[in-house]
Amino acid sequence: MQKRLTLLGSTGSIGDSTLDVVARHPERFSVYALSAHRNGDKLVEQCLRFEPEVAVVGDADTAARVAAKLREAGCKTEVTYGPQALVDVSESDGCDTVVAAIVGAAGLAPSLAAARAGKRILLANKEALVMSGAIFMDAVRDNGAVLLPVDSEHNAIFQCLPREAALHGGVSKIILTASGGPFRTREPATLVDVTPEEACKHPNWVMGRKISVDSATMMNKGLEVIEAHWLFDLPGERIDVLIHPQSVIHSLVSYADGSVLAQLGNPDMRTPIAHALAFPDRVDSGVAQLDLAQIASLSFEKPDYARFPCLALAMKALAEGGVASAALNAANEIAVEAFLSRQIGFMAIAQVVDAVLNTLPNRSAHALEDVLEADAAARRAAAEFIARLPDGARRTERAVQ
């Protein structure tokens, strides 16, 4: 039976890759709803090609522009806007599958709505689990939702684990691989001078600006450790990170008997997306077959926590529990936004996050309101910390120590 998709974040890199796979298999997939924040022109192009019933944007002005262009083109897609509209298309009876690809905390509410509606969820928005892990996983279990990871690392782990949960007891640990980003071998003393353009040039993957910066600081890998904790019900001590510059092995599972299973493939997000879309079937993703002879060699190294303090901060937040991970994520979003707008330097990102974690009290996350309050408090604290920095010193590491 054809799957009906709501694609949250359709104009981003994950959205592009998802629609590429969907277009290859029109007999399997159709689009119920697409969403974008403010990239109305690209959303119009997608609507004209895939003819969704609903398109969601971030604000009324963008909605009016998109609706006018669609009417002019004779497209009948309904255009709505705002956070509630995202929730509506995520829990609608018009779809059975929700691809959650909105970057950041903005993706939490619609992803949670999809879980509570019992949808099949393809999760690319790691923040939903980072912020509200127990709450989100409870919603999935209590409402019969199906959760399939789209992040390449978590999708790799999913493929390497036994299908039956009862057999997961044989798992010794999971190993998330990381490319090390664009600054893996750069002299640490020069990192204070990194520009947004340099940070956004990932050596292997095509990604959006925010996640590219997170990869450069390795905060992205830290968030993935937290996500893996909730997805696979393993403590942080049994989740390792391994630098693998070629990005060919996407992650590994180590078993009690000494076996290690790994998932390999070319670094292209269409592979995990196609796997999750068609699961348990396999379909063509458009990705070239892996040629190991051409690659010739694969290398590995341990992460340098001095070079990548954000990775250590994420591990610390996971160990502390409560709302610490939500605060970590919120502070990082504010810090990365400030870096991209050239308000602070690259090395200041970790310092801002560290300052927020050390300032805000941690507490239990019993309900979504607890998470949202921690998120808001961390954003305020991060913004206030950045604002207190002298203008001439914001781009130095020393200014935020």
UniProtKB/Swiss-Prot annotation:
Highest taxon above the source species: Bacteria
Cystines in this chain: none
EC number: 1.1.1.267
Binding, Mn(2+): D151, E153, E224
Cofactor or coenzyme needed: Mg(2+); Mn(2+)
One Pfam family cited in the UniProt record for this chain: DXPR_C
The reaction(s) this protein catalyses: 2-C-methyl-D-erythritol 4-phosphate + NADP(+) = 1-deoxy-D-xylulose 5-phosphate + NADPH + H(+)
Keyword Acetylation: no
Pathway assigned in UniProt: Isoprenoid biosynthesis; isopentenyl diphosphate biosynthesis via DXP pathway; isopentenyl diphosphate from 1-deoxy-D-xylulose 5-phosphate: step 1/6
Enzyme category, top tier: oxidoreductase
Binding site for 1-deoxy-D-xylulose 5-phosphate: K126, S152, E153, S179, H202, S215, N220, K221, E224
UniProt entry keywords in alphabetical sequence: Isoprene biosynthesis, Manganese, Metal-binding, NADP, Oxidoreductase
One of the protein's GO biological processes: isopentenyl diphosphate biosynthetic process, methylerythritol 4-phosphate pathway involved in terpenoid biosynthetic process
Molecular function GO terms recorded: 1-deoxy-D-xylulose-5-phosphate reductoisomerase activity; manganese ion binding; NADPH binding
Residues binding NADPH: T11, G12, S13, I14, R38, N39, N125, E127, G208
HAMAP family per UniProt: DXP_reductoisom (MF_00183)
Task performed by this protein: Catalyzes the NADPH-dependent rearrangement and reduction of 1-deoxy-D-xylulose-5-phosphate (DXP) to 2-C-methyl-D-erythritol 4-phosphate (MEP).
Family: Belongs to the DXR family.
Protein name: 1-deoxy-D-xylulose 5-phosphate reductoisomerase
The gene coding this protein: dxr
